Amino acid sequence: MIDFLTDFSFSLHFSQPTFFFIGVYYYLYLKGIYKINMQRKIHQELSLLFAVLLAFYFYPFYNMKGQVVMIDVGQGDCFFIQQPFHKGNILIDTGGLKNTDVATKRIIPYLESQGVFSLDAVFISHQDFDHCGALESLKTHFKVKEVIESFKEKRIGNLHFKNLALDKRYVSENDRSSIIYVTINHLNYLFTGDISQEVEKDLYQTYQK
């Protein structure tokens, strides 16, 4: 039997457990131990424990809220967008530090704690290291379906992303950042990369209507 099972390779990924889940788990576990000591059957406890594990495993897929989070990457930007019901998981920029692997030390642990084990897209606003330096490590250690560096409009799941970057030829690389606009849960978000006040003024004059 052991030799048979070793032929199969699979794993289950769970998000970070909540206090409620931990409490229910240990309640059922201790109740089961008590019944075993009393030489009583534990079918009910096993069934409930299995149901709790199943519900916890699928929790990200029936989460109605979604979220927009700025991940602490030390220097630079890294925003995580999760659509309701696991319809899309997206990063905008990755951050980057010269002496630390930000992807394996900060980004991936956070994503896995949220029950996220692949990314539908990673947007890169511009090529400064503190905005894209962790990208290669992230692609090596994590499933990334698409990297988007230059675009006008992009739909991912239920979200419609627009790049509001102006056609003016700015000298600075920072001022040529993608300016990503998206509406999430009736709130408008603008991710501006590293643009200067000059570009902010130009942006306001262009889109103030």
Predicted regions and their residues:
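Transmembrane helix-bundle segments that form internal channels/tunnels in multi-pass membrane proteins
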Residues: 1-69
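Intrinsically disordered, low-complexity boundary segments flanking structured domains
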Residues: 55-58, 147-153, 202
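Conserved beta-strand hairpin/beta-sheet module of binuclear metal-dependent hydrolase folds
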Residues: 63-109, 113, 174-196
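Active-site metal-binding motif and surrounding structural segment of the metallo-beta-lactamase
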Residues: 84-91, 95-149, 206-209
